[in-house]
Amino acid sequence: ILLILFILLYCFAIFPEISRQKRMKAFHGIMFAHRGLHSKTHGIPENSMSAFRAAVQKNYGIELDLHLTRDGELVVFHDDDLKRVCGRPERPEDLTAAELTKCTLLGTKEHIPLFRDVLALVNDQVPLLVELKIPERNMQICQKAYEMLRSYHGAFLLESFNSEGLYWFRKNAPEVLRGQLSSRLTKEKSDVSWFLRFFVENLWCNFLGRPDFIAYKLTDLPKLTVTLLRIFSGTTIAVWTLRTKDAIHEGKQEYDIQIFENPVKIINK
């Protein structure tokens, strides 16, 4: 009886949204340029307007990251703070949009872009894969992102490591295709509790967001839960971040959506 109960609870915890896999198939086979088609060799920084232009020119989908500024605007930026990319100690959430858009990226003349400007640039030329960065359980970013994306006429997917963010979309914007990001989070140093990271790593938080797809780190696969979801529910699996020819080949052969970080040979294809 206990074993049966555990199996039932496990299935309840990991089960995704399965009714919209036909919609997800439109994204199968798409290669998304991780943070745009950026390259130090070409002087194109990550999550920059030039990286997004390059991806559009090569007809790649674009994966990008969103933070909410102190004054409630959305900017495209990956890290939790500005140290690595901009040489400043603050977090994106600590500054206004005006302050952030003055910050240059990795020593170039490129600046942190506003999400609205990226949407205007892409303008449905290629699909978008939008990751929400949600520190301190601030769901205001979900509302703001939805306000902008519902008036955008292009194809997009939304994803986050934060299952509460996916839950917000499930309840308030169920039409948006949403994905659970994950990896072997328990191996990483983090301020987030080990137990929460364990749950997200094993996709036990799927009961909150009921994701339409799973985006998992390729080098952390195979993973039992991911394998079970593929076999029994046909769940779409995206893999990240593919940086070599072998990884790209594996991603294309074994999984549905590929998120790559552009080797020079790919940029010049």
Q: Which residues are covered by each model-predicted region?
A:
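Phosphate-group recognition and catalysis centered on beta-loop-alpha active-site segments
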Residues: I1-K269
